Amino acid sequence: SGVGSLQAAEAGVEKILTKGPSRVDPLIVPKMITNMAAGNVSIAVGARGKCTNVATACATGTHCIGDAFRAIQYGDADVMLAGGKESSICPIGVAGFTSLTALSESNDPMRASIPFDKDRDGFVMGEGAGIVVLEELEHAVSRGAQILAEVVGYGATADAFHITSPAEDGSGAARAMVDAMKEADVKPEQIEYVNAHGTSTHHNDLFETRAVKVAFG
């Protein structure tokens, strides 16, 4: 999770204001911290290996998968569960993105979130979760697992530019993609699909387009 439970934080503040600090839920801190998403999965399935959470906003799930890939690659584990979840449709979540002017103001459902369109004006908030099982290749083959895909490269970089805007030249994101391709030993022309961030905001889509062009030529 990138933000933990905003709802728990809201409920805690409301309880402080209406009934005093002594009436706050004693579990409010575990509910708020981001690593509880991974912790609850660990408890549910009895997984007792490495259990961490990366909190990097919209890149959280991808970075968690990348870290799980590295854990297997380094020999720390044979199997890892990795993914992300977010549930931030609540007053503070909506208000925060509204103040950022990141949410679409369109009343037309077909035009409310239109990434890379010249008339884009923001995104529509959603909630969801997704988890993948990563497994060392020989371990998966030996037990007859149904292998759906193989992770062969991973790149992660920082723009060191601004707290809400990507680097204007797309250099940071481009280098992450180039690093992943180098590790995978694939050429740009071999890539058939790019899963873009595509927030439908003016700056993100513009700078992300530049990043893709830099990485793929």
Predicted segments, located by residue:
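Generic structural signal for well-ordered, non-membrane alpha-helical segments
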Residues: 26, 30-34, 38, 61-65, ...
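Stable alpha-helical structural segments in soluble proteins, enriched in small hydrophobic residues
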Residues: 64, 176-184, 211, 215
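Conserved beta-ketoacyl condensing-enzyme motif
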Residues: 1-56, 85-94, 188-206
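Acyl-CoA/ACP chain-elongation machinery
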Residues: 78-121, 154-168, 196-205
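Active-site-proximal alpha-helical scaffold in enzymes
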Residues: 34-86, 124-145
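A glycine- and small-aliphatic-rich helix-loop capping segment at beta-alpha/alpha-beta transitions
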Residues: 3-21, 71-74, 94-107, 168-169, ...
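Condensing-enzyme catalytic core mediating Claisen C-C bond formation in acyl metabolism
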Residues: 108-186, 190-193
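Conserved small-residue
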Residues: 41, 61, 68, 97, ...
